Amino acid sequence: MARLLTNSQAEELHKSIIAYLSANGLPETTAILRKELGVTEHDFNATAVKKYETLLEKNGPLLFAYRESRDSKAWLPQRPRYSLHSHRDTINCIAFHPKYSSIASGSDDCTIKIWDWELGELEVTLKGHTRAVRDLDYGSPPGAVGVLLASCSSDLTIKLWDPADGYKNIRTLQGHDHIVSAVRFIPNGSLLASASRDMDVRLWDVTNGYCVKTIQGHTGWVRDVCASLDGRFILSTGDDMTVRLWDISAKPENKLTMVGHENFNECCAIAPPTSYQYLAPLARLAKVSRAGSTAEFMATGSRDKTIKLWDARGTCLMTLTGHDNWVRAIVFHPGGRYLLSVSDDKTLRCWDLSQEGKCVKTIRDTHGGFITCLRWAPAILKDTPTDAARALVRQIPDVAEIMKNATFEESFSDVQIRCVVATGSVDKKLQIFAG
């Protein structure tokens, strides 16, 4: 069982079992287990017992169902485990901590709230922005002590928060001339990308707070931005109805401009390497070339109610239809086979890329209003150091080699993927879907 759980999950399970045994009148068994697991009386007082005594009964079926269904590559969200409510206005954005069971949500109420998604509890409320919080992202940039949380706002600023220091606001970045609509940490470096209604994409050095590059080309509000896994490329989209791929490895270069949507674009995503085996046939490729980039395939969502899949040549491979209103957010399943989307039609849809983008699941009635945001908990390693695994991935030049290596693929999916999805809405609720 330990192989399937993070340290945090294992600790919660141990405490839940101890509390359950204690509540059911088994003091000797409780004492033996507490000693075996190293849980002291100080660590597990009466308050802790009350907190955990019903947790096993609530989450036990989910835990064992997860053990029985170990193919995390095929997991899709079902009904929400928790519906969390504390914001006083629309939730615009969410972000998962890369290691722990924390999730951040940002709202029109100008606050950021940090929750424990395993327990369904609010941990802290962050105040600092003076207008709506538009986007959030966690990252671990070199030079920073641990993980940082970035937030951006309609107040024209970007703020950096330190989770290790009680989420202290350690830096405020200023430079955009209008609403800052999106932020994303760029992997393998100290850069943060931001998108704004001022039509610019900016790159910031989070170690000193300086804007190091301003990327121009869009002719309207830039709604969203994301980065490739190696940090070489960023993808941006917005109200000019274009999708732009930029090579930021040297002088910013508009490598590719894609046009096809018939209304403002709301969101974009770069496909992970695990998706290549499903997307390559759509591009009539036998496999991805060794000379290929880490931005071989992309997806965009629009107010025209569609999702489009693109390749690195700028070709629209497919248009996914089914939503009845604006597509607000999209995310690729870490296993690569599925693409998930949410919309103002109040649905979460799952599209199977192995079946030419067929919609195989529609989840309705979990929110009472437009669904504004969607995130999948980032993958983690439980048995292998994260840096070592990343180094291994970087040493394999062809994604096809990963797919051929069954042992690596199995460990990559079973050990890394966290089956947790979250959505936020104008109904002020944060929904947690967990397997």
From Swiss-Prot:
InterPro entries: Dynein_regulator_LIS1, G-protein_beta_WD-40_rep, LIS1_N, LisH, PAC1-like_LisH-like_dom, WD40/YVTN_repeat-like_dom_sf, WD40_repeat_CS, WD40_repeat_dom_sf
GO molecular function, one term: dynein complex binding
Predominant localisation class: cytoplasm
One Pfam assignment: WD40
BP GO annotations: cell division; establishment of mitotic spindle orientation; microtubule sliding
This protein's UniProt keywords: Cell cycle, Cell division, Coiled coil, Cytoplasm, Cytoskeleton, Microtubule, Mitosis, Repeat, Transport, WD repeat
Listed CDD domains: WD40
Subcellular location: Cytoplasm, Cytoskeleton; Cytoplasm, Cytoskeleton, Spindle pole
Subunit structure: Self-associates. Interacts with nudE and dynein.
Identification of the protein by name: Nuclear distribution protein nudF 2
